[in-house]
């Protein structure tokens, strides 16, 4: 992948059937409708004109609500696609953008952003040999424009007390995935009954408790398989899987291959 752009309309009833993460950058722009997106351990409410930045490896799930039809535009690209911009402007601009996770474009400026995106869609159809250069330049222009719109704007005011507590629980899981965590333990930590916590966690994040915990553990295990020479058994234990067979089954369910085969696919023996 170098660069991809897609425009999608989703009905209110649509929800991502599973969480996912990927090895490339993603810009998610909401054209119409309303949705919330849970990224790693943080919840964001999106309205038309909001742009979300997702960096490689971030676990996320989108849930739509209130509007019968929701329209979004997604731009995906790998790190190398930004090389020319980084060399010209330095990495500060892109680093600060992707650390912010969300930018709200003022209503009076949305047409500018959407025109740039539409130009990328046009060039993406492959007009001629200049199209790849034009798409790259339009993306760079969009990123500079977004950096000018950037504000430290929090969604905390939109969240209920219960939602804030769920964010706190998710952050705890995110940083303590290697421990033998249980639903009861985390529910007690934020002073909720296990049954209520289970329902609330699902409604806020889009994930079931076990699903979220397993996805975090598998993501970290995949990185250890690629970047270390540790044995599969040691990685399973380090990532909170007390049973090697369960680790293998969970890994294959999410990644489609066994841990050993995944490592071989990366060219690692």
Enumerate the language-model features and the residues they cover.
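Conserved phosphate-binding and hydrolysis motifs of nucleotide-dependent enzymes
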Residues: 33, 41, 49, 206, ...
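Non-catalytic, well-ordered alpha-helical scaffold segments
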Residues: 114, 133-140
């Amino acid at each position: 992948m170098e660069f991809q752009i897609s425009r999608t309309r989703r009905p209110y009833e649509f929800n991502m059937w599973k969480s996912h993460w990927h090895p490339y950058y993603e810009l998610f722009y909401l054209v119409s409708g309303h949705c919330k997106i849970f990224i790693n351990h943080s919840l964001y409410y999106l309205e038309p004109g909001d742009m979300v930045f997702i960096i490689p490896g971030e676990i996320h799930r989108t849930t739509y609500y209130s509007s019968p039809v929701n329209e979004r535009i997604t731009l995906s690209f790998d790190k190398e696609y930004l090389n020319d911009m980084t060399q010209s402007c330095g990495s500060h601009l892109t680093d600060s953008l992707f650390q912010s996770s969300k930018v709200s474009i003022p209503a009076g400026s949305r047409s500018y952003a959407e025109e740039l995106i539409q130009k990328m869609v046009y060039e993406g159809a492959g007009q001629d040999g200049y199209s790849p250069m034009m798409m790259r330049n339009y993306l760079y222009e969009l990123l500079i424009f977004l950096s000018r719109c950037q504000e430290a704007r929090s969604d905390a005011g939109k969240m209920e007390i219960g939602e804030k507590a769920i964010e706190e629980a998710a952050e705890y899981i995110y940083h303590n995935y290697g421990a033998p965590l249980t639903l009861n333990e985390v529910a007690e930590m934020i002073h909720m009954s296990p049954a209520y916590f289970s329902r609330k966690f699902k409604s806020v994040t889009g994930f079931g408790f076990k699903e979220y915990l397993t996805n975090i553990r598998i993501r970290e295990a995949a990185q250890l398989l690629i970047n270390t020479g540790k044995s599969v058994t040691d990685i399973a234990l380090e990532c909170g899987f007390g049973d090697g067979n369960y680790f293998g089954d969970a890994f294959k369910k999410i990644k489609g291959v066994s841990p050993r085969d995944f490592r071989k696919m990366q060219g690692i023996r």
